[in-house]
Amino acid sequence: MGLTNKTAGIILAVIGLSPFSLLFAQQPNSINFAEHVAPIIYDNCVECHRPGSIAPMSLLDYETVRAWGPVIKDRVEKRSMPPYFIDKEVGVQSFEDDRSLSDQEIATIAAWVDSGSPQGDMNYLPPAPQFEDDVAWTLEDDMGRPPDLIIPIPEPFTVPADGPNWWMTFYSDTGLTEDRWIKAFETKPSAEGYPVVHHAVTSMEFPDGGGGFLSEYALGKTADINPPGTGQLIKAGTRLNWNVHYAASPDGLDRTDRTRLALWFLPEGEDPEHELIRSHMADNEDLDLPGGEERIRTDGYEYLDKNIRITAFQPHLHNLGTRQCIEVIYQDNRRQTLSCADWDFGWHIAYNYSEEVQPLIPKGSMIHVTSWFNNSKSNPWAGDSRNWVGFGQRSTDDMSFSWISYYELTDDEYDEAVAERHAGFEIGSDD
């Protein structure tokens, strides 16, 4: 029988050691960049903190990391970097692609900075990660191949440095001659356009008049892979409807963008068990955010007329948002919090539940989304905090809803999934 986390915690408590003290007991005064800190930085930070990417500085070399050491320590201890803001004390705690640092990794960085940021023996430095140029797709490694289809907006669009917010609608033909199921997708502004693309939402227009939502890109978001057994149908002859929000570049330069959508398909002839749906839920367009108020709560609700299995949730707020929670209200009035996450407008993060804990929600339930806002001087993004703010499309307006990824279950499928979940818990309790 393996040593569980719970058992390990009990043992540590009995002998009077914490994971942090074990760290220092094993490595007294020896934590250095080459052996201990560089692997953490390379694995978790340099995807963004490298030349030509979106971060303000590169962290590929010792000298730069040492210079920024106190700031890095502050950010990782606050868990504002790497950006992954799920509340570790509330709700579901198992996620795919969790980019947050472990407590031990944070302790290692803090101890290194506090000890003077020693370099160590550079012979032990791991090779620095190699990256393709800015037009590469981040999903190529995960999918094992380039995209099957790339669809750009029809023409480049230039955003003037002194211009207002722009909400543009574009139409792109896909050129598809047969129906296909989408496994994964990635939306990518052009390299020059990154600073001015706030969001890019695509919807499908089928030749027969149907269609629906396809994808959403926003600041800090990269790509989506549909869970196993699911996919999104795109039909032959589909036209894409783009809704792109541009804002003037903060560097005072004119910027030209040509955003593109990359699609990876399931193998021809392979149909998924379920069609994945991405939809925003519990919208609250009656926002009332008075100036000077530091903690403002809003609530939104969504009734479910079908059984669903939730695979991911992604909060959506604007500059004044600070936190969002999602809970289920069952027909018998029981309430269950699924997840809470802090909010940073620069990072639109989809939190993908691990398959074994994806919430199973019976029809007749209500999704309840609670959001909090700060319209006071303590919020650096508040602008003039004397001003009232309400719902709207501009970044200086605000919003409150959750993007929910899910698929529908028949009554039999729901009952079977619940039975499997209960059986799994019983097996786990015997370990």
Regions found by a protein language model. Give the residues of each.
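Bacterial N-terminal signal peptides that target proteins for export
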Residues: 1-11
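Short alpha-helical "patches" and their helix-cap loops
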Residues: 5, 87, 91, 215-216, ...
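Residue-level detector of alpha-helical transmembrane segments in integral membrane proteins
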Residues: 11-12, 32, 140, 283
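His-enriched metal-coordination microenvironments in redox/metal-binding proteins
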Residues: 136-412, 422-431
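Bacterial N-terminal signal peptides
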Residues: 9-21
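Generic detector of ordered secondary-structure context
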Residues: 8-9, 29, 64, 73, ...
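Aromatic- and Gly/Pro-enriched helix-to-coil junctions and flexible linker segments
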Residues: 23-172, 190-191, 198, 237-243
